[in-house]
Design a protein with these regions (language model features):
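Basic, flexible Lys/Arg- and Gly-enriched helix-loop patches that mediate nucleic-acid binding at interfaces
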Residues: 2-158
Length: 158
């Protein structure tokens, strides 16, 4: 079976778990490795913490207790984040999360591409497409970013 551009056949083909997670849109491959190392991923009921673990189409893969499937619909969401929200998926300080501003009908697990500070406002992108996120978010993409900064203090021309 070929799904989302990768060959994965339950009879003979296996792929590394972090690659599978990236293709499912859970996170980039590197971020998927961190999920695995932190014990947040299980395969067929067993928590996996070793990189390079191979999986098949028929395996039950959970991230934070939620099932992950290759057939997942890709989502791309642009949000004008207001100041006073954090871009992380969780905040130990209990501050409001930007993802909570997304429509409730978005049931897929999405995460931000890039970050804006808590006090900053502006465009932030959410997706469940790990390859897309890596292409935009990785420094090697060398994408230009533009910021408008307002200051109450005069800024010298130098």
């Amino acid at each position: 079976m070929k799904v989302n551009g990768i060959g994965l056949n339950s009879m003979d083909n296996e792929i590394r778990l972090q690659v599978y997670l990236a293709h499912c849109g859970v996170a980039s491959r590197r971020a998927s490795e961190e999920l695995i190392l932190s014990g947040r991923v299980s395969v067929n009921g067993v928590v996996v913490s070793a990189l390079g673990t191979k999986v098949r189409e028929t395996d039950l893969i959970l991230v934070d207790g939620q099932p992950v499937r290759l057939e997942q619909k890709k989502r791309y969401i642009a949000l004008n984040k207001p100041a006073g929200y954090i871009c992380s998926a969780k905040d130990p300080q209990g501050r409001p999360l930007a993802q909570d501003l997304l429509p409730k009908d978005i049931t897929e697990r999405v995460y931000t591409i890039g970050r804006l500070d808590f006090r900053s406002s502006g465009l932030i992108l959410f997706t469940n497409d790990g390859d897309f996120a890596a292409a935009l978010g990785h420094p090697s993409a060398e994408l230009e970013k533009e910021y408008l900064v307002e200051s109450t203090v005069p800024v010298p021309d130098e």
